[in-house]
Amino acid sequence: MVYARPIFGLCGGILWLSPERRSFTILFYVDNSFICSGRLCRKGGVNEHKRQLHNVFTLIPFVLLYLFYDVTTGAAMLSGVSSHILLDFMTPTGCPFFYPIYKGRYRVDWRHKGSGPREKRALTTIGILAAILLLVIYAPSPFAPTSAISQWKGSGSGASNNRTDINVNFNFRGNGDTWIHPYPNGSIFIDYVSDGDSRVYRYRGISRGGQGKHLKLDSNTTENKTTKQNETGG
């Protein structure tokens, strides 16, 4: 039982994780295998399962990883460790969640009357899976490390999919045409046409993710050349 988790972690990291994250996962489980070995556990006073390491303070490194390094990695590790602790709550032995501040155990005694333990364990498992699913849905792209705080600020190294700041780029051409790039939403092209007496502006929206599809039909705006100067700088 002691070596089953390190072996599973090594195999899973080699098969499913990207190359830059395999070393981190292998290091984590190798370190875990030494800590959980029989002699070290007995010397450290953690030789029994569901004791000192099953507490709220164990979650702090994974919360920091989620906030300051990478949302995807932090969410995966945080959901895995927290679900393990929550499932330990569902056992009669329980675990000391606030150890060492409070050494009392939080547990569920399945021997009382009412609905059976299978139904309650199934309901708990469904709730945990739903929470993990929400973390996966709202996590950003896994191809580049992006922390949660940088995503909130809209300045992460990965794809920022919730930024609120305005960044508009204007590209003026010599013939009066204008490109407006309101990143990251798309582009607006203003086509300037002049016949000497009047000028026509045609607006066309282009989506960055839609491979050049028009967001709306071209709209024409005609102005008298003698009443208003050219505002596009062309």
UniProtKB/Swiss-Prot annotation:
Q: Which InterPro entries match?
A: YdjM-like (IPR007404)
- Name of the molecule in the record: Uncharacterized protein ORF4'
**Annotated region Disordered: where?**
212-234
**Keywords noted in UniProt:** Plasmid
The record's listing under Pfam families reads: YdjM (PF04307)
- At the top level of its lineage, which domain of life is listed? Archaea
Q: Where is the composition biased (Low complexity)?
A: 220-234
